[in-house]
Amino acid sequence: MRSINLETALENKRVLLRLDLNVLLNNGKITDTTRIDKILPTLKFLIKQKAKIIIISHIGRPKGEIVNKLSLKPVSEDLTNKLNENVKLITKDINQINNLDLFKNIEDKIIMLENIRFYAEEEKNDHAFAKHLASLADIYVNEAFSCSHRAHASIHKISSFLPSYSGLQFNLEINALKKITSEIKKPVSCIIGGSKISTKINVIKNLIPKFD
């Protein structure tokens, strides 16, 4: 994918921006904004380019059901404060949304769709669901590096329907990965962190020969 910062003709284009805003919540309050802070440069770039931004993301594992405590509302509020731009959360059923529902008001610049994992079609990588999402925008930007191994509709299938780009933070992650896979100077050790160790077994096996 090309980097979005190489695309200059973005004014009034609808940009479907896939983010990983899977933040920790405690009684509806965000306890760690790191994931939000890291994607701010991409959002600010798109705002500067006068694009119309449609944010897609998830929180938790609602398994295709609406779970109110996993709403993206706290995230939309935090982004509104940090960007000094209203991030309008749309809670309407995504399958019922069409182009006419978005950017009705001239002041609407950033729209956030409700938790994409409220829809079972997302994790099934559903063709029709991805095609519908794509119909809402002109281009797609993947700024969810940590989710990009998943064959989900808003990450994998959607790129079949729209011109696709990588976000600024996505590119930084790729460059960091290149450094530990192709630019290693030995002796070197590797420290791996994170949860869900079962999803990292293959990565660890891949890295073992490269480190001491």
List PLM regions with ranges.
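Active-site loop-to-helix "anion-binding N-cap" substructures in soluble metabolic enzymes
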Residues: 1-212
